[in-house]
Amino acid sequence: MTATSKSCKACGSETKVTTLGSFRGEEGPVAVIVNGMPALVCAKDHKRFLYPEFVTRLMDFVADPEKVAPQPPAVKRGLFKKRYHCSGCNAELPAAPTGKSERGLDASFKNATPFKVVVQVALHKCAGCGREQVLSNEEVAGSAFKAVAHGFRAADIHTDR
């Protein structure tokens, strides 16, 4: 962790590195839960990230579909009306999710104590072969990125304080 003390940009008081509790964000088929993330916190409970690049590193970390979702994803087919098909047997997948995948990840970034991130992703089970898969890696990545941003807002963590 960083040894230098910084003042709060909102109120001017000293900040200290504090381990936050759990916070959650959701977007589409993805939910992200962050547990024990370090942050700079002042006496008035204004929170900000340890350093400017911290937020982008965390968002990129959770937006990697190969880390957070079963692979390979479904295949999108159709000329006019696009539908998702199983990547294993080609059967059409149900439109509604049939299950959920939960992956626990250990986040370890420069100048920060390690913390836990849990990513939940909606799955679609193939009636033909039973394979569970996400519809799209692009959707998982985009939704995970937005979900963690919603979590930051819910926990009131800012880059500019």
Task: For every predicted segment, state its role.
Residues 1-33:
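Ordered, small/hydrophobic-rich secondary-structure cores
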Residues 1-4, 31-36, 71-83, 92, ...:
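Short, flexible, mixed-charge glycine/proline-rich loop motifs
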Residues 8-11, 42-45, 86-89, 126-129:
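Short cysteine-rich clusters marking metal-coordination/redox-active sites
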Residues 14-18, 51-52, 94-96, 134-136:
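Short, non-ligating residues that shape and space the ligands of small metal-coordination modules
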Residues 21-22, 28-29, 52-82, 99, ...:
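Short, intrinsically disordered terminal segments enriched in charged and Pro/Gly residues
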Residues 25-37, 100-123:
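Short linker/helix segments within small regulatory modules
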Residues 84-100:
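Short flanking/linker segments adjacent to small metal-binding domains or redox-active Cys/His motifs
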Residues 113-116, 121-146, 150-151:
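C-terminal charged interaction modules
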